[in-house]
Design a protein with these regions (language model features):
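Phosphate-handling catalytic cores of nucleic-acid transaction enzymes
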Residues: 1-230
Length: 230
């Protein structure tokens, strides 16, 4: 996605501040906006959903972006700029995972109590971050890997995790019981793996006159909710 029209960036104070900050840091405003949206969504409680306009299920706010750019073009810098704008994401872990099974383990774990295992919430939110798309492709291409389909399940807020005979390792997180965002940095040569998608955030910027702004953006404080509201 690209937003070359100044009318878009000037339509809201927050958008203008994002663009000004990105330009002052010599990074793409489009990429900074995309990651900023991810961070704001990560801080949003999982019980906040979209209305069921199609079918009977709610829509999820879970979100993912791909930052596209050549080596050294500032993909990581754009990620860092968004972090400076929205530093508080409610203690959400920011990490990559090597398998689909590990995703559910970010949100919950089985603990033994009185001889029985129960599911305990570790965190209601998480950000999956892959600084190189080649790493994500390698992990997804591994034999019997379910990483990619499990990541796709995140975007619609579906139940994640598998039920196994080993109750200690059986971690399933209910639908809309977690908040997840995904940020992947990719070089143009890697875009083939995302060709089924609808778009990506460009890391290029035509602006050439950097200027400095002050202040930061934050989201209102909210009470921490369980990742298993149902």
């Amino acid at each position: 996605m690209t937003f070359p029209d100044d009318g878009f960036w000037n339509s809201r104070t927050s958008l203008r501040e994002i663009k000004d900050y990105a330009v002052s840091r010599l990074v793409s405003p489009d990429a900074v906006l995309a990651v900023t949206l991810c961070r704001i969504i990560a801080a949003t409680p999982p019980h906040v959903v979209l209305p069921p306009t199609i079918g009977s299920d709610y829509g999820s706010l879970n979100f993912g972006v791909v930052i596209l750019g050549n080596p050294g073009s500032g993909k990581d810098a754009a990620f860092g700029a968004a972090k400076a704008l929205v530093p508080d994401i409610r203690d959400a872990p920011v990490t990559s995972v090597a398998s689909g099974q590990a995703i559910s383990a970010l949100f919950g774990q089985r603990v033994q109590e009185d001889g029985r295992f129960r599911l305990e919430c570790k965190s209601p939110r998480a950000m999956l971050r892959y600084s190189e798309a080649s790493n994500f492709r390698a992990l997804s291409s591994a034999r019997e890997s379910n990483l990619q389909p499990e990541v796709l399940s995140l975007f619609s807020g579906q139940q994640i995790g598998d039920y196994t005979k080993n109750r200690e390792l059986s971690v399933t997180i209910p639908e809309h019981g977690y908040r997840a965002v995904v940020v992947i940095s990719a070089q143009p040569s890697m875009m083939g793996m995302f060709e089924a998608g609808v778009g990506w955030a460009s890391n290029s910027d035509s602006s050439t006159s950097p200027h400095t702004v002050t202040g930061s953006m934050s989201v209102p404080s909210t009470r921490k909710r369980s990742c298993f509201p149902h």
